[in-house]
Amino acid sequence: MFKLGKNSINNMAGIDGRLIDIADVAITLSNIDFGIPSTGGLRSEADQAKLFADGVSKADGTINSRSYHQSGKALDVYAYVDGKASWDKLHLALI
């Protein structure tokens, strides 16, 4: 059985408590270890704009294109495979 690490827990600061509860249960049921990346939780408008500029997000963070991350209503995860983060869809499907 897996459990969320200290960094993943810290990366969920400011997120809706219901999402935290879901992540806590999901990690115990998952077939593969996973974590929450540093940009996977609550984001400021500036953080969101940078992710958009880097091509990582489709939402630019402005009033017309806000991300649910900006209100704490979204959480990103990565699969933890062979000692490193993976965003491979095959790995993510196992979570």
Identify the function of each model-found stretch.
Residues 1-95:
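Cell-envelope/glycan interface and biosynthesis
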